Amino acid sequence: MSQVHRILNCRGTRIHAVADSPPDQQGPLVVLLHGFPESWYSWRHQIPALAGAGYRVVAIDQRGYGRSSKYRVQKAYRIKELVGDVVGVLDSYGAEQAFVVGHDWGAPVAWTFAWLHPDRCAGVVGISVPFAGRGVIGLPGSPFGERRPSDYHLELAGPGRVWYQDYFAVQDGIITEIEEDLRGWLLGLTYTVSGEGMMAATKAAVDAGVDLESMDPIDVIRAGPLCMAEGARLKDAFVYPETMPAWFTEADLDFYTGEFERSGFGGPLSFYHNIDNDWHDLADQQGKPLTPPALFIGGQYDVGTIWGAQAIERAHEVMPNYRGTHMIADVGHWIQQEAPEETNRLLLDFLGGLRP
């Protein structure tokens, strides 16, 4: 087994893919979809494990990232376009069906692919972000897109505060703060919402007498690092490690830094710009179940898992073939990187139970 870099033509969009497979080049296809601010490299621990278990594995750079196509027009980053890229990957490999696994922004793309194209989806796994219907990202009070995102974000953030997704959608402020120190910004964000960073923040809150157990979920969000005072920078709330964690090395940080030095953030941030557009585009799907076999993997300290608690609790209502929720202890947002062995075990158990 050896990893091969390929450029796929997915309905006119260039998609960079890193592929691996068993020696006989056979086996079910598994497509891996990364989130923000990441890369195919986010799946570096899963690619060999899945290929070694007999699957053809394809980890892509989503459009706007890495060596994949970049578009100036923001509407090119609507979720239906991202789902179209996944369909194009299957077509490039001549696959009628594939298993699709997504983390962070990759999870809504994976879920929506399964929702819109159930005949092409052998099974779907969302990591960190549960299925949220037309809402794309589940939040307390609007787990399945009951509210238009931009309206709800204002209420969620509260007076004088800004929800990070809206800050990202505007782009100017976030790009300015990133470009001041790209490498430092990536390290700060990564560590702040990791298990170590979130555990430290939780301990500090408890030591200060905060009763987190009794707090309203919205108050927890407002007190977190991704809800900002107006005029503040996101990185003002970052915490940094004294030494690099074992799961995220200097070499890993160098890789991500190099990718974004070349690609920039215009495309990735446009995913956030389109959240309202996605809500409108998926209106005709409202109330329709997601029918392929589905699994969710969350982290104890993961912000996406915490925000999506209502969507997770009610997953069986909207996914009749839901195979369960698995929570990994002591990890934060970067679940498959922080806990690769446990993630691989859960993926292989799920895929193995569905394999022809």
Swiss-Prot record:
Site label Plays an orienting role for the imidazole group of His-333, positions: 302
Catalytic activity: an epoxide + H2O = an ethanediol
One example GO MF annotation: epoxide hydrolase activity
Keyword annotations: Detoxification, Hydrolase
Ranges for domain AB hydrolase-1: 28-129
Signal peptide: none
Site (Contributes to the formation of an oxyanion binding site for the epoxide oxygen of substrate): 164, 272
Domain of life from the UniProt record: Bacteria
Transmembrane feature ranges: none
E.C. designation(s): 3.3.2.10
Alphabetical GO biological process terms: response to toxic substance
Active site: 104 (nucleophile), 333 (proton acceptor)
The protein's assembly and partners: Homodimer.
Family indicated by similarity: Belongs to the AB hydrolase superfamily. Epoxide hydrolase family.
Functional note: Could be involved in detoxification of extraneous host-cell epoxides. Catalyzes the hydrolysis of small aromatic epoxide-containing substrates such as trans-1,3-diphenylpropene oxide, trans and cis-stilbene oxide, and terpenoid epoxide.
Protein name according to UniProt: Epoxide hydrolase B
